[in-house]
């Protein structure tokens, strides 16, 4: 059998076609792993919140947010997780983190056409609890007149966690 130069280039050419498919498959597996981890972290966060361990809930929700972002999860889920992380941060008296998470939830909700009303309500409520009426009014003004009045429909819906006031030893 004679040696053919064409045969020696065919194998590397085939591997160039197969390698991207393998990499895409591995990428899809990694994405699924990240999303499963996010769901597990969300469950841990819910359990911590149900026990009043707001600091642990906040950390678990943050881990879930990070995993959903790595797994390229949808914006609605990310918005939900940020909202819950904001609630947990508020319960842990971490108002800076709570504001960040509520703002992220609002921004992501707008991208996904998911309702941002609960996050707006929580942010306003947090400012009011802190005695920051000016900031609460500014958030209401972001909404506009009709949307701000529509928040009244959520009066009986979830609010921020109620526990010992911040600054009181647990």
Give the label of every model feature segment.
Residues 131-170:
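Terminal, low-structured helical/coil segments at or just beyond the last alpha-helical repeat
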């Amino acid at each position: 059998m004679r040696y053919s130069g064409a045969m020696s280039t065919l194998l590397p050419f085939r591997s160039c076609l197969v390698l991207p498919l393998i990499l895409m498959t591995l990428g899809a597996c990694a994405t699924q792993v990240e999303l499963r981890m996010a769901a597990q972290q969300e469950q841990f966060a819910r359990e911590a919140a149900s026990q009043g361990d707001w600091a642990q809930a906040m950390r678990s929700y943050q881990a879930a947010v990070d995993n959903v972002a790595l797994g390229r999860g949808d914006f609605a889920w990310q918005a939900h997780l940020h909202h819950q992380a904001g609630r947990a941060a508020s319960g842990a008296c971490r108002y800076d983190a709570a504001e960040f998470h509520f703002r992220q939830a609002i921004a992501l909700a707008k991208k996904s056409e998911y309702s941002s009303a609960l996050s707006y309500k929580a942010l306003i409520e947090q400012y009011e609890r802190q005695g920051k009426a000016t900031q609460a009014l500014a958030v209401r003004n972001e909404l506009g007149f009709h949307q701000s009045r529509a928040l009244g429909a959520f009066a009986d819906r979830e609010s921020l966690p109620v526990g010992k006031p911040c600054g009181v030893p647990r």
